Amino acid sequence: VHLTPEEKSAVTALWGKVNVDEVGGEALGRLLVVYPWTQRFFESFGDLSTPDAVMGNPKVKAHGKKVLGAFSDGLAHLDNLKGTFAQLSELHCDKLHVDPENFRLLGNVLVCVLAHHFGKEFTPQVQAAYQKVVAGVANALAHKYH
């Protein structure tokens, strides 16, 4: 991902304020509610029958935290996203058979959740930088599919 020094600074400054536990669960939960077909990958998570059930599900929250932990690793290695996400790409492709389009959807949901949490601080410039990052992460996660 090519970010200007200003974009990198904006991304890392905002990320330092992110509550990974809260935002991770919310982002994954929203993905499962807004794109219900993604729930098929999480059948072992129990009750996902209503938006409230999804958003309150402890397994959704725990996995969302795990997902954002991996995203944090990616932010620390923006110049090597394919290497950083190689094992996760292989896992999601070969073992879990996740449609790589879901990575793009989750990235877009994450941007929406960040905008909601940070309001005016999530300026158009910050959003543009985050869109680049989530697109880069989605491409890295889809790498083994090509």
Curated annotation (Swiss-Prot):
The modification S-nitrosocysteine is found at C93. The modification N6-acetyllysine is found at K59, K82, K144. Coiled coil: none annotated. Heme b binds at H63, H92. Red blood cells. InterPro entries: Globin, Globin-like_sf, Globin/Proto, Hemoglobin_b, Hemoglobin_oxygen_transport. Pfam families: Globin. Residues 2-146 form the Globin domain. The modification N-acetylvaline is found at V1. Heterotetramer of two alpha chains and two beta chains. This is Hemoglobin subunit beta. It comes from Hylobates lar (Lar gibbon).
